[in-house]
A protein has these predicted regions:
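Sec-type signal peptide cleavage vicinity
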Residues: 2-388, 394-396, 400
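C-terminal, surface-exposed recognition/capping segments
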Residues: 400-526
């Protein structure tokens, strides 16, 4: 993880803003630039005349940020400051005014009260003063109106503290920003992503990253109320994501976030109107990162948004030598394989005598698959361990693709190495039951929450990849995005017409009987 820091420090008075970039290389800290403000004091009222160098202006609209560098900051005409008067009471200023209308780096604030001490404390915050404790609200819902635009910084929770020093007839100070900032810079070479727009970004943590915070005299933020572990950044009509390299003008997205070390789940919400068989689809591409968010720092997080593609050539009859549409796959020169619904008059399906066809068994009883690709699958006992002890979690929104179309929905299971007691020899709750010899349906309700962020590497994902059905449905492609079906290596022992398969959908993971003539997924489990 690479962090590069740019400090904008004043030589006399001004605003401190640190920019931190996060990519994937080494680290470096460099480059100082100056900014300054001056402040004029009058007994019984105080006028703050904020002055900044034009190339490095101060304050609450953050702009001109570049990846790996800091940013420029200017005042808004709605900005106010808090100043502690001679009696130790916080006073809120009037809104900013600008001596030169076109120069937003220069602002004047007027504050009622008496100010004659050598120093006075100054606070900038988005929250009006209630009582004697300055607070800031880091918003759990933030809105960005255009790409690479951080006009909402002040409204979303930017804050700062300073000690105003009396110099002659003026008070001068350097404002230190005490919230942290994240800048998300996505790119993609994936066709489905490039056909989409980013409509919002969810940033989630295992600890609070938003809420109402008390601002200590040194600027330390302490959660007071309304803690939220998620920040949602909305992007209006959406940002394009058709850039293969980082292009901040396309989609750089900013949020204010509480300082501290956070392990984040960042879910980019995409709207795609071109690639789902049923019409527009809204779903997520998810990234994970752990960072230490330094107060006053902009952390650049780049991301290559990709979507897992499941090729479509691993649908099989149970224990068949070849896939359901062998030689005529959807992407072959002579495709028979339906990628959507097949017409009912079609006769293109696995026929007796072909490698894609499995004859019916002649008798019931225990039977394990003979083909190598089926022998590599979990047997019935192992699949029961995944169901009952694998902590299944439903994921409604993660996007995936197959056979030229975009879908969403699937389930997370713990990997075998993370399931205590995992064995291939017996039922997880009954050591005397071997499901290869005794048929038992096994089911468990799936959690509707995603797994814990810091434990995601213990899980693997199965998409709701549908199946090819027989009988009255006449070999149609069914339920993609709604249900997933995965073969085991074990036949059902109680009859000659069934085999064990995993079925997963929104609320349930189940090990149960399926017809061997159906085309279900064959894939090894982790």
């Amino acid at each position: 993880m690479f962090i590069k820091t740019l400090r904008l420090l004043s030589s006399s008075v001004g605003c401190t803003l640190i920019g931190a970039a996060v990519t994937t290389s080494c680290s470096n800290d460099d480059l100082l630039q100056n900014a300054r403000e001056s402040h004029r004091v009058v007994e019984d009222s105080m006028t703050f005349s904020g002055v900044s160098q034009e190339e490095v202006p101060t304050r609450t609209i953050i702009y001109d940020h570049t990846k790996g560098s800091g940013a420029s900051v200017i005042w808004r005409n709605t900005d106010k400051i808090l100043v502690k008067d001679n009696a130790g009471q916080w006073r809120q200023s009037a809104t900013a005014t600008f001596p030169i209308a076109s120069k937003k780096s220069n602002a004047v604030f007027t504050v009622a009260g008496s100010y004659t001490s050598p120093t006075h404390a100054v606070v900038y915050t988005n929250k009006g003063l209630i009582g004697s404790q300055p607070q800031v609200e880091i918003k759990k819902v933030q809105t960005q109106t255009a790409p690479n635009n951080f006009d909402h910084a002040g409204e979303s929770g930017d804050c700062g503290v300073a000690t105003a020093q009396k110099v002659g007839s003026d008070y001068k100070f350097t404002l230190e920003h005490k919230a942290s900032f994240i800048c998300l810079i996505p790119r993609s070479s994936n066709t489905y992503v490039q056909h989409s727009k980013i409509t919002k970004i969810e940033i989630s943590s295992e600890d609070d990253i938003a809420g109402v915070y008390n601002i200590a005299s040194d600027g330390t933020l302490t959660l007071a109320s309304g803690g939220s572990k998620t920040i949602t950044l909305t992007t209006g009509s959406g940002f394009a994501i058709d850039n293969t390299t980082a292009d901040m003008s396309k989609n750089a997205s900013y949020a204010v976030i509480a300082p501290g070390r956070h392990s984040l789940r960042i879910r980019y919400w995409l709207r795609n109107t071109a690639d789902n068989p049923k019409g527009p689809i809204d779903g997520t591409v998810t990234k994970y990162v752990t960072l230490t968010f330094v107060p006053g720092s902009i952390h650049d997080v780049t991301a290559n948004l990709s979507i897992n593609d499941y090729g479509g050539t691993n649908y099989y009859m149970w224990d068949a030598k070849a896939n359901y549409w062998s030689g005529h796959e959807w992407n072959s020169a002579d495709p028979w394989q339906p990628t959507k619904f097949l017409t009912t008059s079609s006769t293109n399906y696995p026929k007796p005598g072909s490698d894609s066809y499995t004859p019916n068994r002649t008798a019931a009883g225990s039977l394990e698959a003979s083909t190598s690709h089926f022998a590599a699958l979990p047997n019935a006992n192992e699949m029961a361990w995944y169901v009952l002890k694998g902590d299944p979690h439903y994921d409604a929104d993660e996007l995936w693709s197959t056979m030229g179309y975009l879908y969403k929905g699937g389930m997370w299971f713990k990997k075998k190495a993370n399931i205590a007691g995992f064995t291939d020899s017996h039922h997880p709750d009954n050591a005397s039951t071997d499901l290869r010899n005794t048929y038992t349906r096994v089911a468990k309700a799936a959690s509707l929450q995603l797994p814990v962020i810091t434990e995601m590497n213990q899980y693997f994902y199965l998409p709701f990849s549908g199946y090819y059905s027989t009988g009255s449905n006449n070999y149609k492609f069914q339920t993609a995005g709604l249900t997933g079906y995965y073969w085991t290596s074990s036949a059902v022992p109680s009859n000659q017409t069934g085999s064990y398969a995993l079925t997963i959908n929104k609320g349930l993971a189940a090990l149960q009987e399926a017809s061997p003539s159906n085309g279900l997924i064959v894939r090894p489990f982790e």
